[in-house]
UniProtKB/Swiss-Prot annotation:
EC annotation from Swiss-Prot or TrEMBL: 3.1.-.-
Subcellular localization(s) per the UniProt record: Cytoplasm
Superkingdom, natural source: Bacteria
Function: Could be a nuclease involved in processing of the 5'-end of pre-16S rRNA.
Gene3D superfamilies in UniProt: YqgF/RNase H-like domain
SUPFAM superfamilies, per database record: Ribonuclease H-like
UniProt name for this protein: Putative pre-16S rRNA nuclease
Amino acid sequence: MRILGLDIGSKTIGVAVSDPLGWTAQGVTTIKRDCYTKDVEAVMKICKEYGVETIVAGMPKNMNGTIGPSGEMVKNLCEQIEKSFDGKIEFWDERLTTVAAHRAMLEADLSRAKRKKIVDKIAATYILQGYLDRISK
């Protein structure tokens, strides 16, 4: 059972996938956003490649727990994905995952250019790993 993690932003979508046992998350790629149709096609291609049964999308919430414009954008894209996807889609509170990803990359002494290229993929990995840790308990 593979699970896909998504960090959906306005310009890119970070993608991570679980190992077959659902224990660990690995970053896969960063999709450059285009339009809903092409975004969905790109996500579905990865789902088919890895045999994904569940998608976990990071839900950006405000610090007070409300959902703002970014959260609405995530919900809208997931509604489009749902039309093509046979599995289930779940949301995961992604507050501070990008901050954690930046911190980890700074500690690894990655250049600014390298950080910019992989931050969304790393954030997707954090989102998915958090979800995997929760369901394994």
